[in-house]
Amino acid sequence: MTSSNLPYAADAESPLKPAELQVLRAQYEKEGDYVGVQTKFNYAWGLIKSNFRADQQEGVRLLSEIFRAHPERRRECLFYLALGNYKLGNYGEARRYNDLLIDKEPGNLQAASLRTLIDDRVSREGMVGIAIVGGLALAAGVVGGLLFRGQRR
């Protein structure tokens, strides 16, 4: 199943325009050492939606800070922590945060669609891993056979 079949997971593939992210960055930087939780959340959200890995990592870091320091904002952070980790390829972490959200909100369609994306990606990468291991085993067998054959002569 692709993300086009999962309208609620559209956030996974739709970055902000650079100018939109710059507005969030400017507000975050303007507030400096006294940045508000909402400003920090907004900036982290924009970073996670980015196509750039460094931005996504920074977004996850900022949301993790909010998650730890502001228990009243944890529910809001869960989806975007799951999404950020998904985009970074940290599927175990993505699943953990997403499952926490689903436990709190079993009817959350956004979290349900993200669960499907995570499961699909894990399956796909698992198959690629199996193919790589199989290819390596085949290559080792061929090399071993050639070496064995060479020793018999």
From Swiss-Prot:
GO CC aspect terms: mitochondrial outer membrane; peroxisomal membrane
GO biological process, alphabetically ordered: mitochondrial fission; peroxisome fission
Membrane topology: Single-pass membrane protein
Transmembrane domains' residue ranges: 128-148
Keywords in alphabetical order: Membrane, Mitochondrion, Mitochondrion outer membrane, Repeat, TPR repeat, Transmembrane, Transmembrane helix
Entry's Gene Ontology molecular function annotations: lipid binding; molecular adaptor activity
Name of the featured protein: Mitochondrial fission 1 protein
Organism: Emericella nidulans (strain FGSC A4 / ATCC 38163 / CBS 112.46 / NRRL 194 / M139)
Lineage, uppermost ranks: Eukaryota, Fungi, Dikarya, Ascomycota, Pezizomycotina
